[in-house]
Amino acid sequence: MGKSKVLIIGGTGYLGRRLVKASLAQGHETYILHRPEIGVDIDKVEMLISFKMQGAHLVSGSFKDFNSLVEAVKLVDVVISAISGVHIRSHQILLQLKLVEAIKEAGNVKRFLPSEFGMDPAKFMDTAMEPGKVTLDEKMVVRKAIEKAGIPFTYVSANCFAGYFLGGLCQFGKILPSRDFVIIHGDGNKKAIYNNEDDIATYAIKTINDPRTLNKTIYISPPKNILSQREVVQTWEKLIGKELQKITLSKEDFLASVKELEYAQQVGLSHYHDVNYQGCLTSFEIGDEEEASKLYPEVKYTSVEEYLKRYV
């Protein structure tokens, strides 16, 4: 497949910076939207300069200046948005509606990847827990705008980010694995799908000029990474040579604890409920033509066990 000109929005963020690296690594001419809102955030500025030194182009543009967005979009074939959808950080999913309008105005984009990268909102609109459902609702608003505008798209469903889920052994609010005890959600046997964020970026970039992924949802669900919480914990125990004390948290007690939290945390915990208590991520079948590790067998993805080794 040929190389593309790729514009990445949110290129200094948690996933965005990985998308930039993956785009450069795969040989695409990579542009990063440099927003004035970055201000004097020296870490982000230094990251942008680092990417520039690696060959990326910095393009000035702002969601407050529609024409600047249009001009930035006109430079490329592919637009990827990595705008944050996490309420405990900055939640800006609907900001992408301006980007959709800019892409429509420019008229030259061959593929748009909006900020998805989690669970597929189309699959869980009727079952997602409130208030976490707001994230899915907003992603569907963006999807409908994309499709109404006739913009070629790929939606990437990446399931669970390893850094957030595996690092804390699937416990909310923990990003380092314990060597003493672990809270098990329910019976701990609901399976979920965990992906290294670098792998997510690699797969996402693979899709951008692949005709097989045009106007489709692609799921990153590699077989070795479909595990229950208990299986994740067992993998960790094997690595450290020690069995953890296990404390069971019932669904009822979990829901009661959620009510005591601030709204942003309630949103995040709603997603944990859907994943850990409902098993939503493995509640439907995925065809080989929709699954990233089947589409791109040349990518050596990081297994759960390999990922957890960094914490030993």
Curated annotation (Swiss-Prot):
The protein's Enzyme Commission number: 1.23.1.2, 1.23.1.1
Temperature and activity: Optimum temperature is 30 degrees Celsius.
Top-level EC class: oxidoreductase
Transmembrane segments: none
Residues involved in substrate binding: 271
Tissue expression notes: Expressed in young stems, young roots and petioles. In stems, expressed in radial parenchyma cells and in the cambial cells of developing secondary xylem.
Assigned keywords, A-Z: NADP, Oxidoreductase
Active site location: 139
Family, as annotated: Belongs to the NmrA-type oxidoreductase family. Isoflavone reductase subfamily.
Name of this chain's protein: Bifunctional pinoresinol-lariciresinol reductase
Species this protein is from: Forsythia intermedia (Border forsythia)
Chain's gene name: PLR_Fi1
